[in-house]
């Protein structure tokens, strides 16, 4: 007998955001009467122009779990400075035992990154980057480490303002 599939509100929302589902995991809560199954979902959402967010959702049904994760990702969007479709400089990020190294790449290189990192870069709008993950390959930790590395990105104008110089003085 087929179970009732709940209608998900705002399904297929057309707000110009790119959505990627990274992982759907079946989780179990053991109670006195047996096991309660649920689904935990990890997603990323971005506008393709430097804004990206990560979300987690958990529910008894997969579509509801995905919807919760997408909404959570939309609520947590952060702005990342980009330059010509890549990151402005090298960066390292960590979360738990996961470590991520990011490096800018010339145009035409493409996204050279594994698994969960690739999804983050695609929704962010990065077209050329070289990324390496070290340590844990847990998708959640890799995404958080990628966000940590991206949050360390600064533009030349931000560096100039901190040093009390002009941009021309920094590059000369």
Swiss-Prot record:
One of its GO terms (cellular component) is small ribosomal subunit. Belongs to the universal ribosomal protein uS5 family. Coiled coil: none annotated. GO terms for molecular function: rRNA binding; structural constituent of ribosome. Residues 17-80 form the S5 DRBM domain. One of its GO terms (biological process) is translation. It comes from the Bacteria. The N-terminal domain interacts with the head of the 30S subunit; the C-terminal domain interacts with the body and contacts protein S4. The interaction surface between S4 and S5 is involved in control of translational fidelity. With S4 and S12 plays an important role in translational accuracy. Part of the 30S ribosomal subunit. Contacts proteins S4 and S8. This is Small ribosomal subunit protein uS5. Keywords: Ribonucleoprotein, Ribosomal protein, RNA-binding, rRNA-binding. InterPro entries: Ribosomal_Su5_D2-typ_SF, Ribosomal_uS5, Ribosomal_uS5_bac-type, Ribosomal_uS5_C, Ribosomal_uS5_N, Ribosomal_uS5_N_CS, Ribsml_uS5_D2-typ_fold_subgr. The gene is rpsE.
